[in-house]
Amino acid sequence: MKRLILATAVAGMFMTGAAFAADSYEIDPTHAWVGFKTNHAGWTKAHGAFKAVSGTISFDKADVTKSTVEIALEAASVDTNDEKRNTHLKSPDFLNAEEFPQITFKSTSIEKTGDKTAKVTGDLTLLGTSKPVVLDVTWNAESALPWDANTIKTGFSATGSFSGADFGIAKMADFGIGPDIALDIDVEAIKK
């Protein structure tokens, strides 16, 4: 009888731990937006986005500080609504997409700032250089798809900024843009 009670208690501890373990999600590339804007010669802001976004999120709702995120952007997917400018941005003057095909962000720490908000610090790797960047993140919601109760989605919005000069984007000043680049991010992710 003691063995049965002990076995039940041990099993209960493992089940309790599993109930509070982080959930894994895959970013839905059809519902992911990584936008940016930067100074355009003082006239206004130049806007753009990356069309190819992928990544994973490990989301621990019980202790958000134990969560992690990894995102990859295909540099060649940059879109500024101007094909000539897109081609120039992909060149060695800016993103050098042929030599550095991916831009990545990998979280290193998370600080909870509210019930649904956090500061996510991570390493942004651009042009082969990694620097810390802080994102202000809001968890928007999580629910099953209205047309498919077996598919669970969660959604996040984030903002942040960095200096393109810190990553060696060589020609920003020559074209009167930057150096600061503001990020505007919205992602939906599907629970695995």
Describe the residue ranges of each PLM region.
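Low-complexity, acidic/polar, glycine-enriched regions of mature
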Residues: F20-K192
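Repetitive helical segments and hydrophobic/amphipathic motifs
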Residues: A11-G12
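Bacterial N-terminal signal peptides that target proteins for export
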Residues: M1-L6
